[in-house]
């Protein structure tokens, strides 16, 4: 099975095109204004319009107002929504696009129970828990906390980079991996060399 790759926190058209050229299946745009990787829906639209076919454009939100989600869907031309806060299942499924639900993993959290609440999601994204930081922390979590029988496709995130993505895939067996800080030169500025190295790491995992 080919592991899908999403490069998140895109703010520049050249970074999006580099990611896609190097093999990424999806690019993520952070519509949370407190993030250093924030981009406006209009700016995201300018990037989305340059992408080739069959590349998924993902809008990332943290406890947004419904109107903001609707506006960004309309303006940016998204394909998929990613909710990274404490949004309820009812909130997530009210929109015109499919969604994935992110959860920050820590000991004691029942991931099977959590996943059972979001049966309408197309995937469950597992990220690292850091107090006050919804994502993009650059820190990995203990992959041993991931149950083998998650009922939703697993998207692995949290501190992934070229040096650990092969072992992460071997251990967690995800449907997809999501990377942001691990391929950056600075927050919101991607490094094509790091993206290329990350993609090689994904490729190695598929050959083992």
From Swiss-Prot:
Enzyme class: isomerase
Disulfide bonds, paired cysteine numbers: none
Documented EC number(s): 5.3.1.24
Involved pathway(s): Amino-acid biosynthesis; L-tryptophan biosynthesis; L-tryptophan from chorismate: step 3/5
Keywords: Amino-acid biosynthesis, Aromatic amino acid biosynthesis, Isomerase, Tryptophan biosynthesis
Reaction catalysis annotation: N-(5-phospho-beta-D-ribosyl)anthranilate = 1-(2-carboxyphenylamino)-1-deoxy-D-ribulose 5-phosphate
The family this protein is said to belong to: Belongs to the TrpF family.
Organism whose genome encodes this protein: Nitrosospira multiformis (strain ATCC 25196 / NCIMB 11849 / C 71)
One biological process term in Gene Ontology: L-tryptophan biosynthetic process
InterPro entries tied to this protein: Aldolase_TIM, PRAI_dom, RibuloseP-bd_barrel, TrpF_fam
Keyword DNA-binding: no
UniProt protein name: N-(5'-phosphoribosyl)anthranilate isomerase
Taxonomy, superkingdom: Bacteria
One Pfam family from the record: PRAI
GO molecular function terms attached to this record: phosphoribosylanthranilate isomerase activity
Signal peptide: none
PANTHER family: N-(5'-PHOSPHORIBOSYL)ANTHRANILATE ISOMERASE
């Amino acid at each position: 099975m080919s592991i899908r790759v999403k490069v998140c926190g895109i703010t520049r058209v050249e970074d999006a095109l580099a990611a896609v050229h190097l093999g990424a299946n999806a690019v993520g745009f952070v519509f949370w204004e407190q993030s250093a990787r924030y981009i406006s829906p209009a700016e995201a639209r300018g990037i989305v319009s340059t992408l080739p076919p069959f590349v998924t454009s993902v809008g990332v939100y943290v406890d947004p107002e419904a109107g903001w989600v609707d506006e960004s869907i309309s303006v940016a031309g998204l394909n998929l929504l990613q909710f990274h806060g404490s949004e309820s299942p009812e909130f997530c499924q009210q929109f015109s696009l499919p969604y994935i639900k992110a959860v920050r993993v820590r000991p004691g959290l029942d991931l099977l129970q959590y996943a059972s609440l979001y049966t309408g999601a197309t995937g469950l994204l597992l990220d690292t828990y850091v107090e006050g930081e919804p994502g993009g922390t650059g820190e990995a979590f203990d992959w041993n906390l991931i149950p083998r029988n998650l009922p939703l496709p697993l998207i692995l995130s949290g501190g992934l980079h070229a040096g650990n993505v092969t072992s992460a895939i071997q251990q967690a067996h995800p449907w997809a991996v999501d990377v942001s800080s691990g391929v950056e030169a600075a927050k919101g500025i991607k490094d094509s060399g790091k993206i290329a190295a990350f993609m090689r790491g994904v490729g190695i995992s598929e050959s083992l």
